[in-house]
Amino acid sequence: MAAVAVTPISLTPGVLAEALVDLGAIEHNVRLLCEQARGAQVMAVVKADGYGHGAVQTARAALAAGAAELGVATVDEALALRAAGISAPVLAWLHPPGIDFRPALLAGVQIGLSSQRQLDELLTAVRDTGRTATVTVKVDTGLNRNGVPPAQYPSMLTALRRAVAEQAIVPRGLMSHMVYADQPANPVNDVQAQRFTDMLAQAREQGVRFEVAHLSNSSATMSRPDLAFDMVRPGIAVYGLSPVPELGDMGLVPAMTVKCTVALVKSIRAGESVSYGHTWTAQRDTNLALLPVGYADGIFRSLGGRLQVSINGRRRPGVGRICMDQFVVDLGPGRPDVAEGDEAILFGPGSNGEPTAQDWADLLGTIHYEVVTSPRGRITRTYREAHTVES
């Protein structure tokens, strides 16, 4: 029987609203990704504060579960991991002009390079610190975003070869990023893989030998083992959200549950209306619950009158507009089965019938990445180890 991560969802005492992150789910997901990688190393991406889950805590969980390296966008994100005592290899790949790479070199952060200008700035820091830089070159294979374009790649290789000869850099990796993150069968993936393979061979021909090559995102890690190269670079799957929602959960366990306490229960009469603009009017006598979170906390205003929350095991519809600090749900007529202080689950894994981040994404016309990176403000992030049960 498979072990499934289950997290108790009771609110932390004294917390008004909470984003509970199940670190056991993170570990489960990374172990699954390591299995899917089939011998390739796993770089767990913890950028954007761990996709809203907390970079430090999720990085530790990912490393404990078998991830070999960590990936972030910015040097500051990498330095925050170092400041927390994380010593595993960390790669940062998004840099503004004029960045000071010296703190990164002193902290042993690997630098991703997308242009010769970035290489020149890095070499300035190498000279200033006396530290050799470990670099990964990011190449553009079709996304037309970050990365060295094919036309500039030959001159970049020449500059890299010169820097290697001067013992200024160690060429650790070659990386690229996929266009179709959620379509593993899209033929563009194969076009990109071939371009990436060609650029890897071109580097060898020019005397630049990279230790590792990595192209695969979460989707490719889970469904395209032929694209694994030496390392895979999953992001959203680390947090238990399916990189291909049409294929179901793919064995992943969502790690985040967002919930709050019921602040107030009240009754209204048929014909009375709720919240700004009176966009919802009760058709019968009913009971309402007030939830003390709003759009300032990452509860999208556009979900007003459309979202559902789970209270005492039942889904309840939100009614009226979502306000800055609060919104209202309809409990229905009769004697209320919800009391002040009860727990309201806005979204979670869905294992107990509660809405999921994917449900919110469908309502919003967006992706679940945006949903889980949105909780903020008065929503306190907390962590619990999972209990493991047999299914």
UniProtKB/Swiss-Prot annotation:
Pfam families: Ala_racemase_C, Ala_racemase_N. One of its GO terms (biological process) is D-alanine biosynthetic process. InterPro entries: Ala_racemase, Ala_racemase/Decarboxylase_C, Ala_racemase_C, Ala_racemase_N, Ala_racemase_pyridoxalP-BS, PLP-binding_barrel. GO terms for cellular component: cytosol. CDD domains: PLPDE_III_AR. GO terms for molecular function: alanine racemase activity; pyridoxal phosphate binding. Substrate binds at residues 145, 324. Its cofactor is pyridoxal 5'-phosphate. The active site is at 47 (proton acceptor), 276 (proton acceptor). Keywords: Isomerase, Pyridoxal phosphate. Inhibited by cycloserine. It catalyses: L-alanine = D-alanine. Belongs to the alanine racemase family. HAMAP family: Ala_racemase. Catalyzes the interconversion of L-alanine and D-alanine. This is Alanine racemase. It comes from Mycobacterium avium.
